[in-house]
Amino acid sequence: LTQNAADVCREALQIAKQKGLTISADMNYRSTLWNYGRHPSEIMPELLGYCDIITGDIDTADTYFGIKTPADLSIENKFRFCCEALLKKLPAFKIIGMSFRGANEVQQPTYQCAICMNQEIILTPVYTIPQTTDRIGSGDAFMGGLLFGFLQEQNAKQIIYTAAACGVLKHSMEGDFSIISIGEINQFIQSGPVN
């Protein structure tokens, strides 16, 4: 966007932190928003330093912080490696959540989520998504589930399973937002990874 936008964000984050508010951020990198002469690594690390809850992905951790997660690791070990490196750069965070997309042997989309909370790492099972209506907004749904779980004072496992349910269920809805009931989330979690 612009340097002015970054400055306003910094000021808002400082005020929110002074007021004791919980601050969340989706650190996904959008290259089309960075056309004003500064690299995101010059702006985002400082802004993310104010945040308590962060979602994102391994590639963005590299773009913002230079974290080179080895590609040959399992998803769990990639997440662990990235979180350990992020913790050194963002020591104040309470939760980091990530979702991982893939495909199974018959090329159906898969979705798995991970959380780091209180230095505990938990992964969900791998969910197969046999039919996708629209995946746009699934990251926002994932973050919504993460925030909901946090605000409900769920434990780390409950939070990441809630977030995963929101992310997976969004794939069945048209448009870039989702409206999911708590009953639907709980039913999804109880039915397990074959959904």
Task: Tell me what each language-model feature is.
Residues 1-122, 128-130, 181-187, 193:
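Ribokinase/PfkB-type carbohydrate-kinase core domain
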Residues 122, 126-191:
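Conserved post-catalytic alpha-helical subdomain immediately downstream of the catalytic base
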